[in-house]
Amino acid sequence: MAKFEQKLTDLLRPAVEETGKTLHGIEYISAGNNSVLRLFIDHENGINVDDCAEVSRQVGAILDVEDPISSEYSLEVSSPGVDRPLFELAHFQEVIGETINVKISMPLNGRRKFKGPLVAIENDTLIVEVDSIDYELAISNIDKANLVAKF
């Protein structure tokens, strides 16, 4: 997780938890005046639109006071969904055996994108099987990862 996103997570997690929800993760997409701060929230009973609105109000008040983002941005609050993003080691541990998409920063064997079952996690390294080959991907090298939905 990027340092800025970690700072936002630390700032906003208590506000989300105050509503009885869990902050699954944060994405900040910087695009000039079209930047987006996206919060993914979760709850054991699921998330509905009222939950998102409640968290948006709570978090919006903190962002207005603390003002951690100097440029204009849109705040989006949603559930992680069936293709949930994976941000933390615990998220990966929950989906061992499932198919995931991973995009890494520094290429490994000439590739940056991997899609396959998460076979194991060893010492902060994911082992993802792609075309019968096990790739070892350092969690610190991951740009983005998500669960592949089963239908």
From Swiss-Prot:
GN (gene name): rimP
Function of the protein: Required for maturation of 30S ribosomal subunits.
Coiled-coil zones: none
Subcellular location(s) of the protein: Cytoplasm
Origin: domain of life: Bacteria
Gene Ontology BP terms: ribosomal small subunit assembly; translation
Protein name per UniProt: Ribosome maturation factor RimP
SUPFAM superfamilies xref list: YhbC-like, C-terminal domain, YhbC-like, N-terminal domain
Organism phylogeny: Bacteria, Pseudomonadati, Pseudomonadota, Gammaproteobacteria, Alteromonadales
UniProt cross-references to InterPro entries, sorted A to Z: Ribosome_maturation_RimP (IPR003728), RimP_C (IPR028998), RimP_C_sf (IPR036847), RimP_N (IPR028989), RimP_N_sf (IPR035956)
